[in-house]
Amino acid sequence: MVAVSAAMTQGVGLKGFAEKYPERFFDVGIAASHAVTFCAGLAAGGFKPFFAVYSTFMQRAYDQILHDVAVQKLNVTMLIDHAGFVGEDGQTHQGLFDIAALLPVPGMTLLAPADDVELKQMLAFAYLYGEPLAIRYPAKICRSFGAEFRFGVWRRMNEISSDIALLAVGGRCLDAALDAAEILASQSIATEVYNCSTLKPFDEDCLKALESKRLVITLEEGVKKGGFGEAVAARLRKPVCIGLGVDDKFVRHATVEQQLEENGLTAGNIAGIVKSNLF
């Protein structure tokens, strides 16, 4: 196993690894595109490379992800840090396009942990996985949910049975979904909440079960066009499917809390949408 950075050793949390295993760490400089090609070469040579990169900088390497990794079906794992809202890092550093960019890539597996426990389990899974894989996570992990990672499974996070389902991507969306379910429960409205930690491939069994629902709402810290919500809606025929995320706009400089509120990813807004579609 080797780790690769593109001049972001400290930012992506690889400083300790670099100091402990200098012979297994490579910083290629401000060259994200080259970093992906470099990882492809390492994988072709029998190594297991992990490339840690901010979501916004991953965009620079899309061509290399497609042609050097995905086409070749190489054993490269991309750790997409700072995915989702990054608050006051600025407008250009929001990590909002990686889901829409990676979902259509043939052979690419895409994961999104809800908390640090699930992230660690995904890293262990990635080490044994033999195909192109990306794991997206925010700059700061949300509270712990005790999430247990099961590849390809959208895990239900409450014991409630309902014809309303909230599908959450990532910890902050899951947090909002669970809080929304509590608000609705206080008004005698039952709501199922799912942790969709495997974005690709889809949980086909869960999709079949969702066909019987009345209302499905997806939540993601990313653009709605081409995102997880649109992909889910394309697969469901019967239920009303509403996708929450970022509309066709660039997100303004603000705190993460403000960005979540301005893009509808709060418990109160989610609960309001559920009620407005039931009555």
Go through the PLM ranges and name each one.
Residues 53, 80-82, 114:
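Glycine-rich, histidine-containing beta strand-loop boundary motifs that form or position
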Residues 112-127:
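Conserved glycine-bearing catalytic or ligand-binding loops at nucleotide- and phosphate-handling centers
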Residues 13, 25, 32-52, 61-64, ...:
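Extended, hydrophobic alpha-helical segments in both membrane/secreted and soluble proteins
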Residues 1-19, 33-37, 58-59, 71-94, ...:
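Thiamine diphosphate
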Residues 44, 70-71:
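Arginine/glycine-rich "motif VI" loop of SF2 helicases in the C-terminal RecA-like domain
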Residues 2-4, 25-27, 50-53, 109-112, ...:
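Short catalytic-loop micro-motif centered on adjacent basic/acidic residues
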